[in-house]
A protein has these predicted regions:
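A solvent-exposed, acidic/Ser-Thr-rich amphipathic alpha-helical stretch
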Residues: 206-210, 214-262
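Hydrophobic pocket/interface hotspot
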Residues: 14, 40, 197, 209, ...
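Short, solvent-exposed alpha-helical surface patches in non-cytosolic proteins
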Residues: 38-44
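Hydrophobic alpha-helical core bundles mediating ligand binding, dimerization, or RNAP-core interactions
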Residues: 11, 84-91, 194, 201, ...
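A beta-strand edge to alpha-helix "cap/lid" segment located at domain peripheries
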Residues: 238-305
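Short, low-complexity N-terminal intrinsically disordered segments enriched in polar/charged residues
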Residues: 188-215
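Structured surface interface patches that mediate subunit assembly and partner/cofactor docking
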Residues: 1-16, 20-33, 49, 53-192, ...
């Protein structure tokens, strides 16, 4: 497959998934933990907006801050599709002549830059589909082409912090491709549920927390020793959160690490507060969670002794 065709098809694959995002999904979590659906779309739209000046010889200094901040406006789908169309047109016009482009790390061959763009569109297209319940299937031909290009670059990208740790191989070409880019090929509703649950606790938002738990949820508190206290049902669990956030001085939960495996999740956290005398306090612990259809049905908490 020639490079322009590869690029064109990966951008179209991305655009198809953008076009399917519903109005109520823009704030949802994605496999890119720091980005919402809108953040992810803005990132790729920014790449598309940068493509034209870079492929036509502009330097980073000449472009300046033109593409900083929000690029999506009131119509994120249209903004993203317009940027994608312009980028496709530019690459088709400029790639045949070859040459170099000016990137953040220096001058790079145009072919290499376009390969980078193709990879980003393909992987982020999957990210977007996973986040929005879209079509997770990637074109096997595109997966093969990008995976072949990436094989000699994977460790370089990982060492530079561009991608996360590699996930375990799956034996499936698409799964192994995503794992190489630091993606969990099984990312789905439970991962999204954990991200929302952690964010709700971080915000101290009891209503948001309870909206992410089942009506028959169970919470087992750490204390008192040795077995803690078991709270059953949404009403009982809600009362615990109301007391926790209402009676604690400046409560603040911070996620330190999390992962999901099937219907189970683990969330490692730190809880900070301020005592009545103004002195700070904190404790660190772990939640072992069980999910049902993306909602938390069990939360068992364990605190460092």
């Amino acid at each position: 497959m020639d490079l322009n065709t590869l690029y064109h098809r990966t951008v179209e694959s991305w655009a198809d998934r953008v076009n399917a995002v519903r109005a109520d999904q823009w704030d949802g979590p994605t496999p890119c933990r720091e980005w919402s659906v809108r953040d992810l779309t803005n990132h790729v739209t920014g790449e598309d907006r940068w493509t034209t000046p870079l492929m036509r010889g502009s330097t980073l200094e000449e472009v300046g801050d033109r593409f900083d901040g929000d690029l999506l406006g009131d119509d994120p789908i249209q903004a993203s599709l317009d940027a994608a169309r312009e980028a496709i047109r530019t690459v088709a016009e400029t790639l045949p002549a070859g040459g170099t482009v000016h990137l953040s790390y220096g001058e790079e061959q145009m072919d290499e830059y376009v390969h980078q763009l193709a990879a980003d569109h393909l992987v982020h297209g999957w990210d977007l589909a996973a986040a929005t319940g879209g079509d997770l299937r990637l074109d096997p031909a595109l997966v093969h082409e990008v995976a072949t290009w990436f094989a000699d670059r994977e460790e370089l990208y990982r060492a530079g912090g561009v991608i996360g740790p590699s996930e375990a191989p799956t034996g499936d070409p698409q799964g192994d491709f995503l794992a190489a880019f630091g993606r969990d090929p099984h990312w789905g509703p439970n991962h999204a549920g954990l991200a929302r649950f952690s964010a709700a606790f971080g915000a101290g938002d009891v209503e948001a927390v309870m909206s992410l738990m089942t009506d028959d949820c169970v919470f087992e508190a750490t204390g008192p020793a040795p077995d803690g206290v078991r709270h059953e049902g949404a009403e009982a669990v809600r009362a615990v959160w109301v007391e926790l956030f209402g009676d604690t001085g400046s409560p603040a939960f911070t996620e330190e690490e999390s992962f999901v495996a099937g219907d189970r999740g683990v969330l490692r956290w730190r809880f900070d507060w301020v005592e009545d005398d103004g002195s700070p306090g904190h404790v660190r612990g772990v939640d072992v969670l069980r999910f049902r259809a993306g909602l938390v049905c069990e939360k068992f908490s364990y605190v460092k002794g």
